[in-house]
Amino acid sequence: MAIHGDRDDELRLFQTGEHPCGYWSDRVARDLVLDPHDRRLGGLYPLALSWGFRRSGDLVYRPHCAHCQACVAVRIPVARFAPDRSQRRCAARNEDLEVRITAATARDDLFALYHRYLTHRHANGGMDDHGPHEFEQFLIGSWSHTRFMEMRLPGHDGQPSQLLGVAVTDVTEHGLSAVYTFFDPDHAARGLGTFAILQQIEWARREGLPHVYLGYWIRGHQKMDYKRRYRPLEAYDGRRWHDFDDELDGR
């Protein structure tokens, strides 16, 4: 499949075969994938985000299932975002943390935290057997401008800070894309997933970026429903972005 244009300008898309859905065990899924060999992929990626695509490793994809449209791309309009009471409490609860933006490079401490997170939060989910190679292949693109937003508890009396969480974040001219967040399960009560998104919103605001892309909200899926708590929120219907409440009303 190709979006029209001459040979140099056309954008090639591939449709995958059916594969087990990563969200619903009783469903199959398929995706549209931008040509992974296209040398322009890094430049096309910001536009692809605005078309509802997402990155995993070096692949840029969008669900394209024959009998299910539950996955809805959502983004936060940074200038209009206002935290609710629960989100303000989460920010206050984590005021003691340091937030650092670091290069997206594989490190032993990062992988150790990632492995602990998967083992405790997603046991038997198909990812808990990831090794260092899978960690790097899944989260770090060879062409993407990716950063790790590290959340750390400061050390005292000469002790080093403690890594509590990492938000893998792509930086583009259209906004930030929240690729994946993992954290220390011993500190789950802090709400580090929520705190990470709040910090990504502030990061985008500082950089003058208009949106934070959260990936897919999935209708009826409990683990993905948290994304609707960030308001205002915009949803992509395959043609344009509109207010998320229109999606809830059945659009």
Swiss-Prot record:
Alphabetical list of SUPFAM superfamilies matching this protein: Acyl-CoA N-acyltransferases (Nat)
Record keyword Repressor present: no
Catalysed reaction equations from the record: N-terminal L-glutamyl-[protein] + L-leucyl-tRNA(Leu) = N-terminal L-leucyl-L-glutamyl-[protein] + tRNA(Leu) + H(+); N-terminal L-aspartyl-[protein] + L-leucyl-tRNA(Leu) = N-terminal L-leucyl-L-aspartyl-[protein] + tRNA(Leu) + H(+)
EC number annotated for this UniProt entry: 2.3.2.29
Keywords: Acyltransferase, Cytoplasm, Transferase
Record Pfam families: ATE_C, ATE_N
One GO cellular component term: cytoplasm
Taxonomic superkingdom: Bacteria
Subcellular location: Cytoplasm
Molecular functions per Gene Ontology: arginyl-tRNA--protein transferase activity; leucyl-tRNA--protein transferase activity
An individual GO BP term: ubiquitin-dependent protein catabolic process via the N-end rule pathway
HAMAP family: Bpt
Family per record: Belongs to the R-transferase family. Bpt subfamily.
Job of this protein: Functions in the N-end rule pathway of protein degradation where it conjugates Leu from its aminoacyl-tRNA to the N-termini of proteins containing an N-terminal aspartate or glutamate.
Name listed for the protein in its UniProt record: Aspartate/glutamate leucyltransferase
Organism of origin: Stenotrophomonas maltophilia (strain R551-3)
